[in-house]
Amino acid sequence: MKQSVSAEQIELKSSLPGSKKVYVDGTREGMKVPMREIEQSDTNGVQNPPIRVYDTSGPYTDPEYKVELEKGLQAPRHSWTLGRGDVEAYEGREIKPEDDGVKVASKHTPVFPQMDRKPLRAKQGANVSQMHYARNGIITSEMEYVAIREGVEPEFVRKEIAEGRAILPANINHPEAEPMIIGRNFHVKVNANIGNSAVSSSIAEEVEKMTWATRWGADTIMDLSTGKNIHTTREWIIRNAPVPVGTVPIYQALEKVNGIAEDLTWEVYRDTLIEQAEQGVDYFTIHAGVLLRYIPITAKRMTGIVSRGGSIMAQWCLFHHKENFLYTHFEEICEIMKQYDVSFSLGDGLRPGSIADANDEAQFSELETLGELTKIAWKHDVQVMIEGPGHVPMHLIKENMEKELDICQGAPFYTLGPLTTDIAPGYDHITSAIGAAMIGWFGTAMLCYVTPKEHLGLPNKDDVREGVITYKIAAHAADLAKGHKTAHQRDDALSKARFEFRWRDQFNLSLDPERAMEYHDETLPAEGAKTAHFCSMCGPKFCSMRISHDIREYAKENDLETTEAIEKGMKEKAVEFKETGSHLYQ
């Protein structure tokens, strides 16, 4: 009897406090774009309008939706894909025990029930990538959906994709995903890495991490599983993921050859790409820029090659003394990608793993190759983003962004941090968020989160929450710095609520309402404290905002401007000082 994963096995979260799921109708039939609407209380009888924010949580936070993990999410994009008339269903490759890293399938592995689903691919001679449509002047349903989410015109979305400045990762076999866009002229996005390892985690835990990450604001998920049940874990995640899912296919390919890098072949890797494309993976990290001639340059580094995918390919190249087969077969990879609309995330296999190695010859040599590969992918109308570092001190961060834009012709940059110092294990979500905010401001389109467990262990769901929130802060700070037209609205609303002592509105407007309320209630748990004009930091007599209110009230009572009120009050105090004998201490 095959086991299953059910909603009862994981902790599912409802909508955040003070929020409700709302939908904006598109022009296309059945198109409903989700938003999160945050209610606000009145100020002295004057209504404060609700604030609508971008929502990545999927149907899990819709009270009308019944979660059935074994059935997967609904698939609204399926009809859009079929409606274009350029795809066909086919049998697909046979799923084998080796796909899960075993020789014989285990009865204890919870296989996803809907295994009779037929994958889609482009018809002979067709190209189903969003870039191909965009370059042919077509505004797809996915582009309109994204435009509503971002608050821009659909034509702007089409043009950014056509020019290669943005990608819309949307594999035709992942119809459950709600379309989103990654590009420097849109909201800065956040990716959350999940996935098992050889020593930790189960399928249920990884599905739970996915739902947690998207609830807290992850725009995409990467399944970086390296343990057993790789295929099955990915199937459960994709079928239940409302956001795009990325992978590093070389990890699974390595499992298929028993973890021996030198036994990897193009045929094994190609088979893995097709397997994952049929499942619905939206973007592949492919380390095609790790060339044989670059590997010796890393020998003088402090920390060598720190990318798992990069080190695997380097080991293969050195053993065979041949060029990286991902590079030599790159055009063939493009042919696969455009059949399913899988986007490239060109991997930075030679990224710096320490401050000492930042911006070195190996890193920027690989970047030059990624620029070359970007042009090849674009020749096939395949969408591309570029992965970036890594460990970079603050004064060297801007150079990374400038070089990427120049060398890779403006393709979206997707960076891991970067970490700005190496001395804070346990706090690397903070060291990296500093760099993430900076590089997001300079133009990075998506930030890959770092959790407190970075360099220490596999993150659990609480670490995922911590990492996502930390990176949402960095991404939002970057949006503010870039002058995104709607970014300041939530800040202004929260600041107004703070000044007016609307405590619940403060909590609800924050990125993590539950944490904000928890910290407030540690010292002032009573319900009356939710309307008090002070908190436990300053108390009632030293609250600067309460004093500001007193000044304004004084000005109002005396028919004065606030500055005049302060001057008048100072004069009154001066007279009082003289009348009491001009003594400093009584």
Swiss-Prot record:
Annotated Basic and acidic residues bias: 22-39
GO CC annotations, alphabetized: cytosol
Swiss-Prot/TrEMBL GO biological process terms: thiamine biosynthetic process; thiamine diphosphate biosynthetic process
Pfam families on file: ThiC-associated, ThiC_Rad_SAM
Names of required cofactors: [4Fe-4S] cluster
Record-listed E.C. numbers: 4.1.99.17
Note describing how the cofactor binds: Binds 1 [4Fe-4S] cluster per subunit. The cluster is coordinated with 3 cysteines and an exchangeable S-adenosyl-L-methionine.
Protein residues bound to substrate: 193, 222, 251, 287, 307-309, 348-351, 387, 414
Residues engaged in binding Zn(2+): 391, 455
Keywords from the named record: 4Fe-4S, Iron, Iron-sulfur, Lyase, Metal-binding, S-adenosyl-L-methionine, Thiamine biosynthesis, Zinc
Catalysed reactions, semicolon-separated: 5-amino-1-(5-phospho-beta-D-ribosyl)imidazole + S-adenosyl-L-methionine = 4-amino-2-methyl-5-(phosphooxymethyl)pyrimidine + CO + 5'-deoxyadenosine + formate + L-methionine + 3 H(+)
Domain of life: Bacteria
Positions with a binding annotation for [4Fe-4S] cluster: 535, 538, 543
Pathway connected to this protein: Cofactor biosynthesis; thiamine diphosphate biosynthesis
Region (Disordered): 1-58
A GO molecular function held by the record: 4 iron, 4 sulfur cluster binding
Protein function: Catalyzes the synthesis of the hydroxymethylpyrimidine phosphate (HMP-P) moiety of thiamine from aminoimidazole ribotide (AIR) in a radical S-adenosyl-L-methionine (SAM)-dependent reaction.
Similarity field: Belongs to the ThiC family.
Protein's name in the database: Phosphomethylpyrimidine synthase
